[in-house]
Amino acid sequence: MSAQTDQPITEQQKKEQEQYTNLINSLPTRWEIELEFVQSLSNIPYVNYLAQNNYFNDENFINYLNYLQYWTQPEYSKFLVYPNCLHILKLLQDENFRKNIINQDFMNSLMNDMVKRWQSNANDQDENKEKEENKEVPEVRINGTN
């Protein structure tokens, strides 16, 4: 029965309800949207785009960036694929950074610094892996055998 008219629900209404439910269930959750947005901050040209389009002049947007700091907590950050986005999120808390990121040279410098950091981290990981592979395995003796 329909709550509004005390009439039985038609097949068409059932179908429409099912379609509506499927649509609602297919939409991303707030958590998913925020995860995607926070990770998009690792894209420096996108951050520059936000500056060029005056997002950083909107107090509501600045408050939103502050709210997103919860992603720095381990229970949330473990879901990040691009953890450097947290570094950018932290930088965006600073008004001077928000003003400077609109500058193309500043943006390029930041991108170059990030690439150097990635390369350095990759080299460090390669060296650590090589050291692990070259470690001598201690000889294990079982019950007095050689």
From Swiss-Prot:
Its main location: nucleus. It is found in: Nucleus. The keyword ATP-binding does not apply. InterPro entries: Med31_sf, Mediator_Med31. One of its GO terms (cellular component) is core mediator complex. Pfam families: Med31. GO terms for molecular function: transcription coactivator activity. Signal peptide: none annotated. One of its GO terms (biological process) is filamentous growth of a population of unicellular organisms. Residues 121-146 are annotated as: Disordered. Residues 126-139 have a biased composition (Basic and acidic residues). Keywords: Activator, Nucleus, Transcription, Transcription regulation. Component of the Mediator complex. Component of the Mediator complex, a coactivator involved in the regulated transcription of nearly all RNA polymerase II-dependent genes. Mediator functions as a bridge to convey information from gene-specific regulatory proteins to the basal RNA polymerase II transcription machinery. Mediator is recruited to promoters by direct interactions with regulatory proteins and serves as a scaffold for the assembly of a functional preinitiation complex with RNA polymerase II and the general transcription factors. Belongs to the Mediator complex subunit 31 family. This is Mediator of RNA polymerase II transcription subunit 31. It comes from Candida albicans (strain SC5314 / ATCC MYA-2876) (Yeast). The gene is SOH1.
